[in-house]
Amino acid sequence: MVKNYSFYQFIMTVRGRKDDKGVFAEQIFEDLAFPKHEDDFNTLSEYIETHSEFTLPMSVFDDLYDDYTEWLKF
């Protein structure tokens, strides 16, 4: 059975980590305009690329999205 959660809901499980993924999760949490109900990679990627408040490399988002797709399976 696959979970039906948005990327934002997954990101909230990453907040508080002391690594780049945790920092990125905190930046997403602080962005009030972040698309909280979205799960599409391209939509999320475009949003992150066009908003300058995200200071970490896109590779961190890519890794988090991979983690998200794995998390949905369990």
UniProtKB/Swiss-Prot annotation:
Pfam families with a match to the protein in the record: YozE_SAM_like
InterPro entries (UniProt xref): UPF0346, YozE_SAM-like, YozE_SAM-like_sf
SUPFAM superfamilies cross-referenced by the UniProt entry: YozE-like
Taxonomy, superkingdom: Bacteria
Gene3D superfamilies (alphabetical): YozE SAM-like
UniProt xrefs under NCBIfam families: PRK13672.1
The family this protein is said to belong to: Belongs to the UPF0346 family.
Protein name listed in UniProt: UPF0346 protein SERP0997
Organism: Staphylococcus epidermidis (strain ATCC 35984 / DSM 28319 / BCRC 17069 / CCUG 31568 / BM 3577 / RP62A)
